[in-house]
C-alpha cells in the first residue's frame, strides 16, 4: 500500500518489524477491507429514548449501497437545484485529473503514495478554477473515481451560469501539472490528437429527460463513483474493490463539493415541531442482536484508527 516514511493509514494495514512500521500489500488490504466491511455490515448502533426504549440501526459507512444511493440522490438534487436557479443558462464542464501509476522505471507505484501525490494539487486547482470563473456564478463537485487499474483519479464537475468552452479550463490543468509531482502532460491535454475534447468536456445542460450523458453532470459523477450501482463491495469489479481498499486505508472522503453545492445537496428539513424525541447512543450490537449490547460511552474520546509508517534511516 505504501513505503513512504510518515505515511498515515489505517492501523489494521500496518505491521511491525524490528526496526520499522510497514504496510501490507494492496491485495492483502483488499481482503482486510472486506473483513472490516463484513463486520461493520453486521453491527448495529443502539440508541435509547427517555422511556428506556431501544432501537438499533445499521452502522453507517460510505461503502454501502445505501450510501451510494444517497450520494446519487444528492447529486441529482444539485443538478436540479441549479437548473431551477439558472434555467437554460446552466452549462457544465468536467475536468479529469490523474497521476502516473508507475515510477520512472515502469514499476507500479504504491497506491496510497500515488493517491497522496494526486491530491497535492487540489488547493492550486481550486484557486485556478476560481480565477478562470471570476465574476461568474458557478459551483463544483469533485469526485474520486477508480481507473480500470484501481488507481484513483479525480473528476471535477463544474456548473456555470452561462456558456463556457473547454479552452477556458487549461489553467486548471496547468495548476495540476505544476503541483502534482507525478502528473503527466500527455494525460492533461484539453484536446486529443484528433481535436476532440480530452481531459476537459463541456456541455450545455439539457432538459432533465435527457439524463444519459454529461448534461446531467451531477448524477453522472455520482454514478461514476458508484461503480456497479447498488452492489455490495464483494460484488464489485476488482478495480473498484482495490479503489475501496485505498479509500478505506486513507480515510479520505471521495467527494468534495463547493459550499454552494453542499447547500443544494442537503435534504430539506422536516418541520416536526416539538414531537422530536431525544435519543442517546448506548452501545453497539456486533451481531445485530439488541439483547447482546456492548455498552459505549459516546462522550469518551475515540482512539485514533490510523498509524504512520516508519522506515529506518539509511544505514541504520
Swiss-Prot record:
Pfam families documented for this protein: DUF1424
Key words of the record: DNA replication, Plasmid
Taxonomic superkingdom: Archaea
Biased composition, class Acidic residues, residue ranges: 289-298
Annotated stretches, region: Disordered: 285-316
BP terms from Gene Ontology: DNA replication
Record's function text: Possibly necessary for replication.
Name of the protein: Uncharacterized 36 kDa protein
Amino acid at each position: 500500500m505504501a513505503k513512504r516514511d510518515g505515511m498515515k493509514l489505517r492501523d489494521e494495514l500496518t505491521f511491525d518489524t524490528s526496526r520499522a512500521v510497514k504496510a501490507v500489500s494492496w491485495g492483502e488490504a483488499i481482503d482486510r477491507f472486506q473483513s472490516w466491511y463484513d463486520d461493520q455490515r453486521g453491527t448495529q448502533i443502539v440508541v435509547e429514548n427517555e422511556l428506556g426504549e431501544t432501537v438499533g440501526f445499521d452502522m453507517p459507512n460510505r461503502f454501502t449501497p445505501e450510501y451510494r444511493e444517497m450520494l446519487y440522490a444528492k447529486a441529482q438534487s444539485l443538478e436540479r437545484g441549479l437548473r431551477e436557479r439558472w434555467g437554460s443558462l446552466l452549462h457544465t464542464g468536467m475536468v479529469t485529473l490523474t497521476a502516473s501509476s508507475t515510477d520512472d522505471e515502469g514499476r507500479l507505484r504504491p497506491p496510497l503514495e500515488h493517491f497522496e501525490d494526486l491530491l497535492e494539487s487540489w488547493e492550486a486547482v481550486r484557486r485556478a478554477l476560481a480565477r478562470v470563473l471570476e465574476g461568474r456564478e458557478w459551483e463544483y463537485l469533485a469526485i474520486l473515481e477508480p481507473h480500470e487499474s484501481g488507481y484513483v483519479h479525480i473528476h471535477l464537475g463544474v456548473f456555470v451560469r452561462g456558456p463556457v468552452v473547454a479552452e477556458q479550463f487549461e489553467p486548471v490543468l496547468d495548476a495540476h501539472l505544476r503541483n502534482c509531482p507525478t502528473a503527466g502532460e500527455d494525460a492533461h491535454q484539453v484536446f486529443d490528437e484528433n481535436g476532440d475534447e480530452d481531459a476537459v468536456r463541456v456541455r450545455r445542460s439539457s432538459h432533465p429527460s435527457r439524463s444519459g450523458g454529461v448534461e446531467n453532470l451531477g448524477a453522472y459523477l455520482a454514478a461514476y463513483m458508484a461503480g456497479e450501482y447498488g452492489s455490495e463491495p464483494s460484488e464489485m469489479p476488482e478495480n473498484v474493490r482495490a479503489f475501496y481498499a485505498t479509500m478505506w486505508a486513507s480515510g479520505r472522503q471521495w467527494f468534495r463539493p463547493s459550499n454552494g453545492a453542499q447547500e443544494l445537496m442537503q435534504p430539506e428539513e422536516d418541520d416536526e415541531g416539538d414531537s422530536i424525541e431525544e435519543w442517546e447512543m448506548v452501545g453497539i450490537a456486533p451481531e445485530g442482536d439488541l439483547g447482546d449490547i456492548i455498552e459505549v460511552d459516546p462522550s469518551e474520546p475515540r482512539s485514533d484508527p490510523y498509524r504512520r509508517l516508519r522506515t529506518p534511516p539509511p544505514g541504520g
